[in-house]
Amino acid sequence: MAAAVNSGSSLPLFDCPTWAGKPPPGLHLDVVKGDKLIEKLIIDEKKYYLFGRNPDLCDFTIDHQSCSRVHAALVYHKHLKRVFLIDLNSTHGTFLGHIRLEPHKPQQIPIDSTVSFGASTRAYTLREKPQTLPSAVKGDEKMGGEDDELKGLLGLPEEETELDNLTEFNTAHNKRISTLTIEEGNLDIQRPKRKRKNSRVTFSEDDEIINPEDVDPSVGRFRNMVQTAVVPVKKKRMEGSGSLGLEESGSRRMQNFAFSGGLYGGLPPTHSETGSQPHGIHGTALIGGLPMPYPNLAPDVDLTPVVPSAVAINPTPNPAVYNPEAVNEPKKKKYAKEAWPGKKPTPSLLI
């Protein structure tokens, strides 16, 4: 004997009676709330169906606080071909129309009658399988010539109602078939075992930095957009020293040409030199038509002192010795040894 057992205790909540049997196909309940049809519940597969608030124990869940966990049972009598409703000692009762049923006492439910559970506003109406051919068509075959009048008066409303019921029933039946097909298919098909990943939580000791600019302040946010070039310091220093040496040597030559008279600095100028740039006593030269001071930053150092009496001996120069072209040409720097080759120091300089 099949029985519904409460999970919290070993006492059975409902004992299926021996007279219970499988109902005919197409038997169902119309669930109506107000004037709106919510759904159709098919009840043609089992001997009994349980109604209540507990979804684990009941076949149809009643989501209302006034209903008990296992509220009532709907059983089909195989000998009487009738449906019976049994209240399972519910707190707020089970109603057939407006009549409350006695607990644990089967009550016959006629077709098209309405039942309700507790204070729920949903009404459950017992229905048979809707007929494929409407009743008006069967009456046409019997009555013959009077069919047109009855068809106009009673045929259309009845056909529309039966068509709606048939549509709703087929919808509920198709839902049940799809559900059963999925469940049976799940039993036959062996699902491949999924390799479960390790569900344990592990922590890595190494910190993986994705954006270093968020951690290190020295790293810029736009470092990928900046191009860097490496210039060797040694090469730069060599270039700087070489350029400075050339400029310094050039300036020294310019200073030598502007201020120092060389070997013939003490001689008076000739007629061709009177129109050229004059040399000032205090180190001034005409640059761009204006006298500008130009100091000598690197004066020449004479290793052997020049005898002052040598210049005073011959105050008047020989005109044939001087060459005007040689005076205008740039003079090179000459040392004392090269300027006076073979000259020996006099005894007066050594004293």
From Swiss-Prot:
Post-translational modification note: May be inactivated by phosphorylation on Ser-199 or Ser-204.
Domain called FHA: residue spans: 49-101
GO molecular function list: DNA binding; protein phosphatase inhibitor activity; protein phosphatase regulator activity; RNA binding
Positions of post-translational Phosphoserine modification: S178, S199, S204, S249
Residues with the Phosphotyrosine modification: Y264, Y335
Location of the region described as RNA-binding in the Swiss-Prot/TrEMBL record: 330-351
Segments of this protein annotated with the region Disordered: 314-351
Localization: Nucleus; Nucleus speckle
Pfam family, one: FHA
GO BP annotations, alphabetical order: cell population proliferation; mRNA processing; RNA splicing
Chain intervals for the UniProt region annotation (Interaction with CDC5L, SF3B1 and MELK): 1-142
Involved in PP-1 binding: annotated segments: 200-203
GO cellular component entries: nuclear speck; spliceosomal complex
Alphabetic keyword roster: Developmental protein, DNA-binding, mRNA processing, mRNA splicing, Nucleus, Phosphoprotein, Protein phosphatase inhibitor, Repressor, RNA-binding, Spliceosome, Transcription, Transcription regulation
Motif (Nuclear localization signal 1): 185-209
SUPFAM superfamilies in UniProt: SMAD/FHA domain
Entry keyword annotation includes Transcription: yes
Function as written in the Swiss-Prot or TrEMBL entry: Inhibitor subunit of the major nuclear protein phosphatase-1 (PP-1). It has RNA-binding activity but does not cleave RNA and may target PP-1 to RNA-associated substrates. May also be involved in pre-mRNA splicing. Binds DNA and might act as a transcriptional repressor. Essential for cell proliferation and early embryonic development.
Protein name: Nuclear inhibitor of protein phosphatase 1
